[in-house]
Amino acid sequence: MARRSSRIALALVVMAGIVGGLVIYRDYRREIGAERARIASGSQIAMTPCGPIEYAVRGGGPPVLLIHGAGGGFDQGLELARPLVDNGFRVIAMSRFGYLRTPLPQDASPEAQADAHTCLLNALNLDRVPVVGGSAGAPSAMLLCLRHPERCLAMVLLFPIAFAPGDTAKQPPRLFWFVIRTTLHSDFLYWTASKVARGTLFKTILATPPDDFRNAPQEERARALEIMRHILPISEREKGIWNDAAISTSIPRYDLEKLRIPTIVISAKDDLYGTYRKGRYTAEHISGARFVGYATGGHLLLGHWEEACVELSRFLRQTESRTTPSKAK
C-alpha cells in the first residue's frame, strides 16, 4: 500500500513538472515571439560604402545621432532617446556592427564604427549633427568626433565605457563572463534568467546595484525591466556583444584635447562598469566639457534618469542653433 502511494505521489510530481514546464515554455514562446516582432518592424537598411547599416528615425525637429551601447541595436537607441523625441528632436538610431541586421565586418573596431557612422550620415544627407553615445557606444562616438569633426555639432556621453588611468588592464569579474557565456547562446536561458535571476542580471549585464532598482520609483523600475526584456532576442545581438566585450577591456586613451565641440558627460558613482571615473576623466580632458554625476543609479541611472534627460535636452537646445542640417530620409 505504501509503495503504491509512493508511486502515485511520484507520478503526480512528474506530471506537475511536465505541465509546469509546458506552461513555462508556452510563456517563453509568446514573449520571444513578441520581441522578434518588435525588432522586425520600424527600421530600414542603408546600403553604404561601409556596408549595410540598419537604422530607424523617430520624431521631428533637429536631428540627433544616437549610438547605442552593448546589448542594443536600433531599438535600444530609440528607447534611450525617447525623451529627446518627446522634446522635439529627430533621433537617428542605428544598429552598430554585429547587432540585429547590421553585420559584423572583419574590422569592427571603434575606428571602423566611427567611419560607418559617417557613412550613415552621408546616406541620410545629414551634414553636422549632435552625437549621443551611450555605454559601449561611447568609443565610436568619441572617435567619430575626432576623425570627422566637421560632422559633429556636439557630443553627449552617457555612462561611457572609456579610458581612465589604471583601468587598461582591469578585467570584468568572473561572474560577468559566466553570465555572458551562459546566456548569449540561448534566448531561452536569458529569458529564464530575467525571470528567476534578475538580481544577477542587474549586477552583471546591466551593471546596476539591485538596491538601486528596489529603491527606484515605480516608473523607473518598469523602465529597467523593459530594458532587461528588450535585450531579447539576445541571439540576434551576440556578435555585437562579444565585439563590445573585447573592445571594452582594452580601450586606449584618445586625443581628447583635440576635441573642440560642446560636450557633456553623465554617469553615476555606483555604476558597476566604473563609468563614473572614466566619464569624469574624459570630461576633464575635453576643453569646456561638463560632467554631471549622481551618487546612485547604476549604469541605468535609476532614480535620476528624468534629471539626466532634462540636462541632455537643455544641452542639445543650447547647441541647436549652430547648424541647420538636411532632413533624414
Model regions: which residues?
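Short beta-strand/loop motif that positions the catalytic acidic residue
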Residues: 259, 265-267
